[in-house]
Amino acid sequence: MALQSVYYDTLLPEEVISLMEKDLQVFDDHLEDSRVGGGEGGVVEENVRDAKNTWIPDTHWSAGFIWHYVMKANRENFLYDITNIQGSTMQYTVYGEGQFYNWHQDLGISGFYKPNVLPGQCDPQSNATDFITRETEYIRKLSFSLQLSDGDEYEGGQFQLLDETGKIYTAPKRRGTLILFDARASHRVRKVRNGTRKSIVGWIVGPRWK
């Protein structure tokens, strides 16, 4: 299914997704409490996000597999100017019973660049240099979530997106479903009532909007 701000692909090969889930089990020993806010300033806020996650380098074969479908979806639906997976890493996320992630955006106003200038001071050249050295000319444009668990393996845990009219879209729970959406779209993972929900999520960056 393709909309202006969201794209679902439910036709990824089951045998590849099954192999991916098995191969990623080596990362289970590295799971930590998920944080909100991102970067070095991320904090654990279980009233907002209660889950476990770790990071997968984009040198892992799963990243190349996912990137193929990201490019396919972008070509067929978004046509955004994109470059790569942010930070050269993907997030391996696990939700157990009672865990969830409330409504949020992957690119909100708080995520935009703020020059390091003291109040009352203005140094355009310094600002420009700081802007470039921090690589802030790239921003999140697309987000993706690949479902590794089958819908029969857990209850609840629906992935949902919210449009500007307040309408909620619920993504399929089928294993191998790739959900690709505009990083500015509000989304959530509802509370898992039973079982375990596993996924790979990541963010696709590109030149800042003009």
List PLM regions with ranges.
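Fe(II)/2-oxoglutarate oxygenase catalytic core
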Residues: M1-L178, R184-K210
